[in-house]
Amino acid sequence: MIKRILGILIPLMTCATLFAQDYVMFQTSILKLRAGQNHSLQQGVKKHNDKYHNGKDSPKAYLWYINTGPNSGNYSWAVGPTKFSDMDQSLPDDHVKDWERNVSPYADETEVVYMMRDEEMTYNPKNETVGENVLMKRIPIKNGQAHVEAVENAVQKIADVLKKTNAKIARRVYRDAFPDGHQEIMLVYPFSSWSEFEGNVRGLPEGFQNSYEKIHGNGSFRKEVMDVLSTHSDGVTHEVMTMVK
């Protein structure tokens, strides 16, 4: 937060392509809770967001509680959509002091990531930008161009099938604009109820594997998606995040 964050939960070569056109980007960070002070942190962030990130004079800010995954029990704070040019503006003293008064006593801000949306791999039929409740799948890709291309191809094929079948869900794909050591793809699936996870569904529509194999052939989903991710990534984490209002 002490960094300049009037903007805001990708590989550099891809970024170079996207920067030349309009883009959707969020600045996200993890708020690591101190001493279990959930209520105090939630109220403090709400006060700060209402005053300085209400979407009127600057990009809007959001807070999610992280229910699952390596950061479970903590919070994801995000500002956006924003542009890189927003970062050229220094925060006024009162803005910084408000954060120090309302947020810093209850949490440490870590893991700042600039998430840039990859429109080609995104399936977003209702053209939504922010989901109140989301499942975020993080895919850290192994180093090497062959690994990157293999994972990108698998993610793109899923997007193509979602489009061909007019799926009712959305899947927004983001990249880290400043990867640290390895490239990462983040898949964001909005959901309205936890009941959507019944039947071992984790974001994709019920029966998606069958839909995929009708297009690409029997056994293709395991070969072209599951085996590819197993071989070319360091695993997939699942973060279920619910918005704090």
Describe the function of each predicted region:
Residues 1-24:
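Bacterial Sec-dependent N-terminal signal peptides
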Residues 20-245:
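Short S/T/G/P-rich N-terminal loop/turn motif that feeds into the first structured element of a domain
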